[in-house]
């Protein structure tokens, strides 16, 4: 295992980038380039998706968050300002999806609105009548996955 450790253990993000992706590519018949790699997560996993993909856009070309948002950040400056240059971001990320339930107030819709105002291309899905729950995330998954096979 090739990761940096502190007294809390290995960085989850380093494990994904340095260990999991190479293991998957070595073990399974995958396309190993960024053009064929996406990451998605639900709830805290949605936030982890941002924290994994955005600093490593050389490894991913699509991302999805299901009830995952970043709290208390300026979207123009977070992740070294990756969203500030919408043209560059949109060229690098082929598909971005953010979904949530209509009955949850988790910040997803607010963040999506801010990204739209910056010119970031993304699809937003609001699951009708659902909360921060599995039905929301199953619906988000159903909306997200078909887009991964369009480019």
Where are these regions (language model features)?
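Non-catalytic cap/lid and distal C-terminal segments of serine-dependent acyl enzymes
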Residues: 1-151
């Amino acid at each position: 295992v090739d990761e940096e450790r502190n007294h809390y253990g290995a960085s989850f993000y380093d494990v994904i980038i340095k260990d999991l992706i190479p293991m998957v590519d070595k073990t399974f018949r995958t396309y190993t380039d960024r053009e064929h790699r996406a990451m998605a997560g639900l709830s805290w996993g949605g936030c982890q998706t941002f924290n994994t993909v955005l600093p490593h856009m050389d490894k991913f070309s699509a991302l999805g968050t299901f009830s995952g948002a970043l709290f208390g950040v300026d979207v123009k400056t977070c992740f070294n300002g990756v969203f500030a240059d919408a043209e560059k971001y949109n060229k690098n990320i082929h598909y971005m999806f953010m979904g949530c339930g209509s009955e949850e107030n988790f910040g997803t819709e607010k963040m999506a609105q801010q990204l739209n105002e910056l010119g970031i291309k993304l699809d937003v899905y609001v699951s009708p009548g659902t909360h921060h729950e599995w039905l929301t995330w199953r619906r988000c998954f159903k909306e997200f996955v078909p887009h991964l096979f369009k480019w």
